[in-house]
Amino acid sequence: MNTTTVSLERPNVHERRRENVATDINVNALVKNASKAIAPLWPIATFVARHPWMGLEHFSFEQVVHRLKLLRDIDLYPSMAMFRAAQRKGELNPKFLEMRLQRWLDEQPLTMPREEAERFCRAALLHEEIPNELLTSSSLKSLAAKMKDMRLRYDSNHLLTRPLSLLLEEQGKEKWARVLDHQMIKWCKLFLDESQALWAMPYREKGFYYAWRKLVINDPSLNKQQRERLKDLPHDPEEALRQALMLLGIPHGEMKGYLEAHLLSLPGWAGMLLWRSQQSGQAHLLLVDYLAIRLSLEWALIAPHLPFAKQKDDDEAFLLPLLAAWMHWGGWTPEKWLQLPQAEQQARLSFAYRFDKIVRGKLWLEAWEDTQEAQLKKRIASHSQNNEPKQAVAQLIFCMDVRSEPFRRHLEQAGPFETYGCAGFFGLPIKTRELDSSHAHASCPVIVEPRHEVQEFTSAENVKKYRGRRNALLSVSHTFKKMKQHLFASLLLPEVSGPLLGLHTLARSIAPSGAGRVFHQFQDNWAQKPATELSLNRESSLETTETTDLPVGFSTEEKVRYVYQLFKGMGLTSRFAPLVVVCGHESTTTNNPYASSLDCGACGGAAGGFNARVFAALCNLKEVREGLAKEGIVIPEDTVFVAAEHMTTVDDLCWLYVPTLSEAAQKAFDMLQGKLEEVSRNANNERLSKLPGLEGKKKDPLAEAHRRAEDWSEIRPEWGLAGNAALIIGRRELTKHCNLEGRVFLHSYDWRKDPSGEALANIITGPVTVAQWINLQYYASTVAPHYYGSGNKTTQTVTAGIGVMQGNASDLLAGLPWQSVMASDEEIFHSPLRLLVIIEAPQQNIERLFEDDPHFRRKVKNGWLRLVSIDPDSGEWKAWR
């Protein structure tokens, strides 16, 4: 007879996990894959809109919503308060909610009457949430206890991919997750500091992990035992990370998820390190350091609690909300429920589990988006025109930015002017170096690699004079900053600077507009830049000692190609007006860390005027016009290109480059100049009426706009791109007579002039991607402001010269402040909708686009943006899913 020995001893989970860990873990591959859970974060001085989930687009939007809810308890769908407010304002039609519900029910394997399922779902969608009194009632707990033998399949494996420090905290142990975050914030601030701190982090030049390893053993915020555990860490960060994973007992199959969870704990600091690594050409080097430090610290903190024993799943706690749902929304009582056969009980509980808060949020959001699409369709269909436009006196090329739409509309209403829209870098992949600057700025979208550098230059004598005046101003600022940071000099600073700064504060507070004018006049008079030229020609010989890794200027072929591509992409290939104005855009604000977020996203968070000036100058070159003529684009001899900047905070045009004008161009310029004050007044009047506190008030729009731009206490000088909801790619005739309320990106495009589809493909890969990033950043900052936003402007701290925090111990805040998306504490201004892309082109052109660009097709299929095409002949709208 065979005897079987059964061990009654509980296996050591920690030892079992360590045995499962391979010693040859590919740390770099793990970190690379895990880093997709976060997005790179640019310094705030060059604020770039970031799509927080750009690395997760291979998942559907709904899958990412589920994942982040499980990992970080973040709700990525708008709240019920937002949905109900949208319904009250007429932005959300209930009929679309019912349609979405019926579509969802059609996809479900129902094992209960359809009518009952519909009643339950409608009640769950439209009625109040389950009251806490019901969830904690003795009758419900008694009912759940009677059903303890019922087994429902549900996924609780997400617990395995959450940080052990967080799980211990949730079990009532010490606040280990908070302590760990506080430690990482401290070390990241020290390492990433951009000369804001007077004393730099020792050993910083040798790397993050090296410096931390040298310093942490003397960290007084850790106890003696914790410091002892960190004394003998490996010298190599990869080996340290590998060791930490083993000591924590993380199974090989869960390592990627575990690293993701730690990156998502502080996505701002981790995102800044990711950006730094990418800038150095070593895409994930600093994240390896970061995770090696973080997991080593986690092990040092929680070692006494290892091996970690996962708590048993509580079936009763799982059943309670499902039973409460049927009591509250289904109208059942405990007595009637117990009379149901077990199979029917299980069917209803399974259905309630599937129709969870995330599914309800999905249906509400899609109904809101359907309503917006239907309203936009009605507006466009009733105003679009197919007839050819009349010959314009002047044509103006604007950035496709939503803030350009009202200005363009009022401009076209004011006279015989025609406007076009494109990405505000005007197709120029350049770095720009202003006069006497040691730094060149990438003035193109972050997804575009600069290929050229364009520099401002003038005579050596002019540079010398300008440098002297400029250095005098900078030295005052530099001295003030150094005194402020110095331990002893800071004690003298109030005595030295008090009277002058007191007067400045008083003037800025009482009369911001007047004080601003005086300040700008002084700056212009003292440090006025001399007339400069641009290094457009590759063979330009510049009197400069600056070095660059890019070619300076363009060859003739490159000049022609860039100009041709932009004209072709916009459909502007003939009928040129005597005057063509290339308009960049810039925002003017005071005391605003987020100033760059109001500038041009297509120019890397800088003003677009430099690019406008370069493009206009290229268009006036004889060799460019000759090259364009060979490609079939003939520009009349009397057509002159000029450059301007649209100041979005005050809705005005500032002239940057006006060469000698032909007679026809001069007449057009004078006519345009004569209309600008009227256009500015009307555009400001429309824009200011949407700002909180100004609704319905009688104010001089020009004066009020300038006051807000100069007032350093103004938390909302303009709305920026709040409200953005759609991007229209098509002829201006489609939308010229529509009031799109500053909510739509407008990119000019004529499918008839793009037989190959190349121009449309370029618009999709560039401008559409930038617009999507902007849209999803506003979305994230609205629906999850505590995680993806940056809180209240008035309580923010600029830290380490790179970003903002709330207080001195928060994550590096990556998103927008609530003043950028909220009208008040209770009311949102920005409607969190995924971008609706509308393309005016035949259906076969869209099909070809999908074939050629599977990445874009995936965005549409996975719900990261919405796509509609308009047939140019029939006007029929087709939604692509």
UniProtKB/Swiss-Prot annotation:
The reply on keyword Transport is yes
Record GO cellular component, one term: plasma membrane
Which residues take part in binding Zn(2+)? 399, 401, 585, 600
Which protein is depicted?
Probable inorganic carbon transporter subunit DabA
HAMAP family per record: DabA
Subunit and partners? Forms a complex with DabB.
Tell me which cofactor or cofactors this protein depends on: Zn(2+)
Gene this protein is translated from? dabA
Q: What does this protein do?
A: Part of an energy-coupled inorganic carbon pump.
Subcellular localization is given as:
Cell membrane
